[in-house]
Amino acid sequence: MSAPTTTKASASSSPPALRPLSSSLLLTIPTTNAQLVLPSVTVPAARRHNSTKSTNSTTSTNSTTATSKMPIERRAAEIEKRIAAIPLERYRNFCIVAHIDHGKSTLSDRLLEHTGTIVAGDGNKQVLDKLDVERERGITVKAQTCTMIYKHKEDGLDYLLHLVDTPGHVDFRAEVTRSYSSCSGALLLVDASQGVQAQTVANFYLAFAQGLSLVPVVNKIDMASADVPRVLEQLETVFELDTSTAVKVSAKTGQGVGEILPAVIKKMPAPVGDAKKPLRMLLVDSWYDTFKGVVLLVRLFDGTLKQGDKVYSYATGNEYIVGEVGIQYPDAVPQKVLRAGQVGYVFFNPGMKRIQDAKLGDTFTNVGYEDIVEPCPGFEEPKPMVFVAAFPTNQDDYGRLADSISHLVLNDRSVTLQKDYSEALGAGWRLGFLGSLHCSVFQDRLRQEHGASIIITEPAVPTKIVWSTGQEEIVTNPAEFPDPDDHRIRSATLYEPFVNATVTLPEEYVGRCIEICENARGVQKSLEFFTATQVILKYELPAASLVDDLFGKLKGATKGYATLDYEDAGWRQAQLVKLNLLVNKKAVDAVARIVHTSQVERLGRQWVTKFKEHVDRQMFEVIIQAAAGRRIVARETIKPFRKDVLAKLHASDITRRRKLLEKQKAGRKRLRAVGNVIIDQSAFQKFLSK
């Protein structure tokens, strides 16, 4: 591979094959607590954390304060006036990519302050992260965009910058991939204390495959554990990047941040486009607004877009009239026109009512030019990798919970939804997610934004069945997996999804991590030392191992130093069986799982032991079993309450004693045959919790 320097990668380069991903979490964009200002009056806005001062942290002459009180219309007009004076060659569209928790959102805050887009202050934390769950967890779930106007300190000219803050977790890589379509360059951010990690590697190759210009940035240089020379060596060794121009910053204190934007302007190309040509507009993202309908985030390659224009959708064939256009600054600011090279928002009048009509990767053009303008390459729809069933804790809350789930799914097209029913838990839904964290975030959002309490079953991966006739079937619900009595399953071939996993870790933990991967039925592909003490392990692993807390086991074995990244590797033939939990020989359908035959006995013993702890004693004996097909692999028994039927008898009446005991035994047997085991919903909640 001929790795890129900080200039644009050539088309002849041959990056590794990557799985294309696409749309991911979508959401409405509420107002942030950041103060929106105009870049007009100049004041210093350097960060002053802990009295840290640096000549590098001096801000651009764009910073402002008093204009925050300016009326919205005048504020928008001032911004539009400055943008109109900036030619296309002074546009720069770029994103920040890095491993999770390397400081992307904090650096975004400093850049917004440095350009005067928001007023500098200690309250600016994760300004572009709109969700409560993002702020609580300290992660970015949804890629966020912002337009900035920057006055270059060398030539004194205005530059129009479009920034995308991308997620770092592997579950949301589709957000990163889609963000690249609106960018011509990327800041490759690396933590000075952690160094290159798994998703740093993955994001580099994604950017390399897209031909983006890369600017390496080393963050957190103010930390006591920072080792900048080691990180620069890793960037040179692993990526063959020229680190002589790497920018060293502390996003927390603002040190060195002033050097980033000049590097962006110098090393990243301007977007290519022509405002005089017919409209050619790519749909990058969308979200639903109660009053406006579907709002589109778009990138204009050619032409202009303004209120009243009639546009045509290549994906649906529908025509729309533009109601409003604008930019994110960082909140929505209406504009009269969007030009080629810009990224902004648009909604229609009458509004687009169905989020399904906004197909990510769709191309729009002016009505009448649909046969002339060539559509942009689209995105591949993301494939859910993890499926769960969700049920209300109280069936009386079904309607309210249905509305809450529908509202979230409306703004998160990567979630698949269908109705489900369980004899044990009642009516519910079957949900598909991009990964375990995606599922967890969805559940947190449901509880925070709608106050919903739900029971969510253990995550499961899909299974492919190839029948003897050659017909294929994908099973996402274990309850729908054929019973062993079905003669067709005996001649069918079963497949499970696999992933190509990349694990980075310190050298001293290699042995333990290899053992964990081998126990997870992994196949080692390579082991590389990218520094004297850091190792990259590449394994082919079943996707089921990822939902079985493989990452948690790796983190535990390496004292938190291991990092994991993965991508789809297709289907592999496997020996699979459905594991059922039986209560008095009756299957609890909501708990069923499809597992590999090597895991049946271990998982079965765990099930019966844990479930016994949460089931109350009954008036009759309760037998809890784990069954793989027709074979019982584990059993626990809950003894019944015992009534002392001998209390009124004399000790010498042995015949009467025996008769009463036999009668009690027969009664219990009859009760067990006709009685229903009463299992409280809280028992399922506790059993299904980690």
UniProtKB/Swiss-Prot annotation:
InterPro entries given in the database record: EF-4, EFG_III/V, EFG_V-like, EFTu-like_2, G_TR_CS, LepA_C_sf, LepA_CTD, LepA_IV
Biological processes annotated in GO: positive regulation of translation; translation
**What keywords are assigned to this protein?**
GTP-binding, Hydrolase, Membrane, Mitochondrion, Mitochondrion inner membrane, Nucleotide-binding, Protein biosynthesis
- Chain spans, region Disordered: 40-68
The reaction(s) annotated as catalysed by this protein in its Swiss-Prot or TrEMBL entry are: GTP + H2O = GDP + phosphate + H(+)
Enzyme class, UniProt record, top EC level: hydrolase
Question: Does the UniProt entry include the keyword Nucleotide-binding?
Answer: yes
Transmembrane parts of this sequence:
none
State the coiled-coil residue ranges: none
* tr-type G domain sequence ranges: 89-272
Regions of compositional bias (Low complexity) in chain numbering: 52-68
Q: Which PANTHER family does this one have?
A: TRANSLATION FACTOR GUF1, MITOCHONDRIAL, TRANSLATION FACTOR GUF1-RELATED
Its function, per the record, reads:
Promotes mitochondrial protein synthesis. May act as a fidelity factor of the translation reaction, by catalyzing a one-codon backward translocation of tRNAs on improperly translocated ribosomes. Binds to mitochondrial ribosomes in a GTP-dependent manner.
What's the name of the protein?
Translation factor GUF1, mitochondrial
Native source species = Sordaria macrospora (strain ATCC MYA-333 / DSM 997 / K(L3346) / K-hell)
